Amino acid sequence: MAARAGPRAALAGAAAVALLSAALVLYELPPGAVLQRAFSLHKAHSVEDMENTLQLVRNIIPPLTTKKHKGQDGRIGVVGGCQEYTGAPYFAAISAHKVGADLSHVFCTREAAPVIKSYSPELIVHPVLDSPSAVHDVEEWLPRLHALVVGPGLGRDNILLENVKGILEASKARDIPVIIDADGLWLIAQHPALIQSYQKAVLTPNHVEFNRLSEAVLSHQVDGSDHHEAVRRLSQALGNVTVVQKGERDVISDGKQVLECTQEGSSRRCGGQGDLLSGTLGVLVHWALHAAPEKTNGSSPLLLAALGACSLTRQCSLQAFQKHGRSTTTTDMIAEIGPAFSKLFET
């Protein structure tokens, strides 16, 4: 027995170190019972509590096995990419692929397709988003997709936005999870009913996008001094849609629970990090929703997926910054996905 205890103790110690920088905080909840029901926590902010929390994220990650066939671990679609913006959909799709999705699709405009194809032969690129038949063309692929990431590199062209509205409606009709970022959030601010009360939607606004959504949905900007209450209120107003407010500390809420991810990141704020997050989140949402109930221990699959995606994105940023400093780019961060994933979830 003594020989077996050593490796387990070392594993717990390594996990505790990672968890000290990836703390989870819950707000606006009755103490005790809800904490235990949601995350099996027994003593707030202890190392054991944090280990339990990250273990729930680890639990949703499917094991690698030779018994699976291509596609089972995730087929993710990214809707976005236009003449001006080709990097964002690539960042989202390749991040999903590197996290563990078997296939990544990009549905973009005809002009953007050759550019995105040139970035990587590993992505499946569909030049349909500006077509008159765009909704039908994407809808044909929906039965083969596990999650849709909407918004990276989308732009605000009226034709594209109208097509995306139809794609969102078709995705909801098929009960497909949707992660909405960037100009997808601008569209939601104009038409909140598109995702109202859709429980498989996750919004990932930054500070500016969050304020825009709050003004559209709540008719005013919420009190910025209480980020946790602000995110909770926006989620509730949207019908308990999961909201991830990106910031110095990422705040996540489904209107019932509020989580705070304090995983250490870096001070570098280059464009594209949100695309890494949204692509990662697409995969983790798929895994979380398909995990056995005992794996999540009764907690919200989407909250766990969001916490995992935020933690991984921050860890990638930290590792890239340690190597490249001020010159760090999102490409550098994407190169860290494998090592960061292993450090957080497989050690």
Swiss-Prot record:
GO terms for MF:
ATP binding; ATP-dependent NAD(P)H-hydrate dehydratase activity
Q: Which Gene3D superfamilies match?
A: 3.40.1190.20
Q: Which cofactor does it need?
A: Mg(2+)
Phosphotyrosine is carried by which residues? 85
Q: Name one GO biological process term.
A: metabolite repair
Instruction: Provide the transit peptide span.
Output: 1-46
Q: List the disulfide bonds.
A: none
Q: Which residues are recorded as binding (6S)-NADPHX?
A: 153, 206-212, 275
Q: Which family does it belong to?
A: Belongs to the NnrD/CARKD family.
* Full protein name: ATP-dependent (S)-NAD(P)H-hydrate dehydratase
Source species = Canis lupus familiaris
Its gene name is NAXD
